Amino acid sequence: MKNPIIREVCIDSIDQAKEAERLGADRLELCSDLHLDGLTPKIDDVYEVIKTIQIPVKVMVRCRGGNFIYDDSEIFKMEKEVDLLKSMGVQEIVTGALTVSNHIDQNLTRRLVERAFPMKVTFHKAIDYTHDMLDQINILSKIKGINSILTSGGAKNAAEGADKINKIINKFGNRFKIIAAGSVTNKNLEKLSKKIKTNEFHGKKIVGDLDL
């Protein structure tokens, strides 16, 4: 029997954070600019959310939209963001980086993870843009400090990627928490939870509509 479902809600405002908690979210992922799939939030928003919200909060570290290939100035910016979040007492960040060939950027990922310690790290859906996900997750498994992977199985949503997500869980479920993402809502969560062998799911509307 699987453990109780953990519903992780991605939000980009304090009002959404409060509403998600009220609706029964188990954990939040705080971002800005969800229309760009989530960027590093404003520090004032981070402070307000971690001061106000009682459930666990992860914070996105992603300096811009678009691809996950970063130049030196962007790397410097993200390193400083990691430092600041750690100094604020954030418990976990969400980040990820790829090379121009869409492989895991091992050097940058390791740098960010080591800099983040003792914060936990979730590698985000950048993994879905890699060519051989199982091979690339095997590379991630050798980077100490990454405890979770957020994925739609390389598909446009969790339902279509369910088989690949299950393959990832079968191979790496003892190493990582695998969080299924991609159009997961309160309306399809029960069905997805029977199809995908994880108890952790992520979505904007996983506990309902947050627009007040």
Indicate residue ranges for each PLM-predicted region:
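Alpha-helix-loop-beta-strand connector modules within alpha/beta enzyme cores
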Residues: G38-G65, Q106-A126, A162-T185
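Glycine-rich phosphate-binding active-site loops on the catalytic face of alpha/beta enzymes
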Residues: D26-L39, L84, M88-S101, K144-A159, ...
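N-terminal beta1-alpha1 ligand-phosphate binding loop
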Residues: I6-E19, L23-G38
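Alpha-helix N-cap and loop-to-helix initiation/capping positions
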Residues: D37-D45, Y70-K80, V100-L108, D132, ...
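Histidine/lysine/aspartate-rich catalytic loop segments that bind and position anionic ligands
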Residues: P118-N157
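Hydrophobic faces of well-ordered beta-strands that scaffold small-molecule active sites
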Residues: I5-I11, L28-L30, V57-V61, I93-T95, ...
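Hydrophobic, well-structured mid-protein blocks that either form specific transmembrane helices
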Residues: V82-H131
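Catalytic cores of alpha/beta
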Residues: D12-L23, V59, C63, I69-L84, ...
